[in-house]
């Protein structure tokens, strides 16, 4: 069977969806060799980074602002996404051995975390736009209660967006092994396949990039009125870094997903092209997954105050256990750390929440 953009592995040996059966054994063999170690690396680095953000926000910052709430939910989204990777790694190397219920559970967690991460990146972008461009209005709406309400709504939307994957994905025996993959109704196969692909492209690429372009354009216009050229340049570099990183990590996957779904339209409905697209899907999807490893860096650790919290957390909970008499453990107050940017110009908001 062919790839539907719903699970991050390739479980087939032959594709019967073409005019003649297409051998996919090489694709499966490559996936079995490369995907498990790659998924493992993404899991390790992503889990450590996002767990650090989670622990610092809970134990140190105490969720005092809308930005803190969105950062916490972004970390939770990434953690949900990452927790499924060990199971997909095992699936890529072998077959699905965890049963039908767990197939649906892990598919649901994967996509809820996936869409949740995207939606909270969008919320963080809009939040920064309001804080910098419409500062007076932001003082009224950027409350903790508002952050909680919008987060609950965002999770509901993420669950709703993931429902087709949860409903249609199931585990069943195909040939000599069990798979965990989407199975659309035969009479509506092409509709659901196209719908799923267009949904992924719109929600994971077009929508976030559109929001980033609009919001960051307004932020840049405001920052260019800043008198401190050095601080302004740093903020501008950070903004462009966020957009470029997101574009580079997710655009290849969405392009390959479109080409794979509409192979006949693009004249790629032959066995050779299908195999190459499958291999490209493996590479680009893994590349996109690594973006969740960068989220803690580009959305949290760029802030000087957040790095101060990280330093205090590290000294208090990690190194102190091995060196109780070291003078380095004198308690610092992160709230007294100077920010990179001042609130009067709005650059502080860029450094702590972009």
Swiss-Prot record:
- Any Pfam family from its record, for instance, is 7tm_1
Q: Which residues carry attached sugars according to the database record?
A: 6
**Biological process according to GO:** apoptotic process; calcium-mediated signaling; cell-cell signaling; cellular response to lipopolysaccharide; chemotaxis; defense response; immune response; inflammatory response
UniProt topological domain (Cytoplasmic) ranges: 61-70, 127-143, 221-237, 304-354
Q: Which PROSITE patterns match?
A: G_PROTEIN_RECEP_F1_1, G_PROTEIN_RECEP_F1_2
Q: Where are the transmembrane segments?
A: 33-60, 71-91, 105-126, 144-168, 201-220, 238-262, 280-303
Report the superkingdom from the record. Answer: Eukaryota
Q: Which range is the signal sequence, renumbered to this chain?
A: none
InterPro entries reported in the protein's UniProt record? CCR1-9-like (IPR050119), Chemokine_CCR5 (IPR002240), Chemokine_rcpt (IPR000355), GPCR_Rhodpsn (IPR000276), GPCR_Rhodpsn_7TM (IPR017452)
Q: Which cysteines are joined by disulfide bonds?
A: 22-271, 103-180
Q: What is any one of the record's Gene Ontology cellular component terms? A: cell surface
Subcellular compartments: Cell membrane
CDD domains named among the record's database cross-references: 7tmA_CCR5_CCR2
Bilayer disposition of the protein? Multi-pass membrane protein
The stretches that face the Extracellular side, renumbered to this chain, are 1-32, 92-104, 169-200, 263-279
Keyword tags: Cell membrane, Disulfide bond, G-protein coupled receptor, Glycoprotein, Lipoprotein, Membrane, Palmitate, Phosphoprotein, Receptor, Sulfation, Transducer, Transmembrane, Transmembrane helix
Task: Give the lipid-moiety residues, type S-palmitoyl cysteine.
Answer: 323, 326
Function in brief: Receptor for a number of inflammatory CC-chemokines including CCL3/MIP-1-alpha, CCL4/MIP-1-beta and RANTES and subsequently transduces a signal by increasing the intracellular calcium ion level. May play a role in the control of granulocytic lineage proliferation or differentiation. Participates in T-lymphocyte migration to the infection site by acting as a chemotactic receptor.
Q: How does it assemble?
A: Interacts with PRAF2. Efficient ligand binding to CCL3/MIP-1alpha and CCL4/MIP-1beta requires sulfation, O-glycosylation and sialic acid modifications. Glycosylation on Ser-6 is required for efficient binding of CCL4. Interacts with GRK2. Interacts with ARRB1 and ARRB2. Interacts with CNIH4. Interacts with S100A4; this interaction stimulates T-lymphocyte chemotaxis.
Protein name, UniProt field: C-C chemokine receptor type 5
Which species is this record about? Mus musculus (Mouse)
What would be the name of the gene that encodes this protein?
Ccr5
